[in-house]
Amino acid sequence: MNLSRRRILSGLGLGLAAPFVRPSYAAAGSLNVYNWADYIGETTIEDFQSETGISVVYDLYASTEEMQAKMLAGSTGYDVVLQAGLQLPQFLKAGIYQELDRTRLTNWGNLDAAVLKINEGFDAGNRHGVPYTWGTVGITYNMDMVNERLPGVDLSSLDVLFKPENAAKLADCGISLLDSPTDIGFMVLSWLGIAPENAGPADYDKMVAAFAQIRQYVTTFDNTNFLTALPNKEICVANTWSGDYGVAKARAAEAGVELNLQYFVPKTGVPAWFDIWCMPSDAQNTDSAYAFLDYMLRPDVVAKCTDYTGYANANRAATALVDPAISSDPAIYPDAQTLERMYTPKPMTEEQERLLTRAWAQIKAG
């Protein structure tokens, strides 16, 4: 297992993206894919090329803003793009993605009906995308370091982080929070008893106030470095996505470091996230795109993706093929108790996006 990634909800404001136009690839038997780094099986692209003879140009994006800029510019040359479910309605409204011809996806029946039902909230009828991976956002603790400082504390509560007296005791061993307002921000709103979809100006002010009490104890706002900082014991508390917890554990094991990490989903609720393969409206290699999408719906293919990235996939038929160490981990494949704590965020209004962006700037500035 290598560097896993889900940096998908760290940016807001589609209209702020700067234009970028990518060279077009229209050769027969070619495919242009746009995805997060290290967010697919180690040999998936190579295997697809070998099996189909289709030549793949595989581009990576490092931030939501970068992805938005390219897609909103149009004429990108991409045929398949990985899209965050929460932002999908905005992209559909802008006409970025085309409706899929389900008859060309012979492996569609492998998808989990429960995941498809949830995705209806982003895309009515699941007409524009193929669900790929999903998970939660939570807190990863170095149990030994945390228990030494806060013995007996309830780690299923965000009180561990957002009660100043607790955060002060953890400051010396390091606290990392995601630089992602729709993840940690929504978690804190839920902790405050506020439904994120109903949040207004006064609610975002309460969120800012909650962060202000602990801001001095936060080491960093980060979406990447905790994967190294946790195994190196440079931090003891990290707000992470579910799959990244598993990657940090694997990195420690590979380095021969004894590390007692555990991932907790706060009992006050957390947002679930879903990533979806989509086909841009201006895709030029649609035959190749359908071949790739159907390939990614194969249980054997997507199981290898989960084994490599550490993220649960949306393919019901693939679960039995996933490494048992992953499929049996409730942090990655949530149990019934964890599922009860999860909710699917509803798309934000433009006003809510503006308020959250402003609140997040205040929080990070301290």
Q: Model segments located where?
A:
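N-terminal secretory signal peptides and thylakoid transit peptides that target proteins
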Residues: 1-16
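Mature extracytoplasmic/periplasmic domains
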Residues: 26, 275, 280-341
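Early extracytoplasmic/lumenal segment of secretory-pathway proteins
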Residues: 27-91
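Extracytoplasmic ligand-binding site segments that recognize negatively charged/polar headgroups
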Residues: 82-217, 224-231
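Short beta-strand->loop
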Residues: 98-109, 159, 255-271, 280-283
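Periplasmic-binding protein-like
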Residues: 204-213, 219, 257-278
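Conserved C-terminal helix/tail region of periplasmic/extracytoplasmic solute-binding proteins
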Residues: 228, 336-366
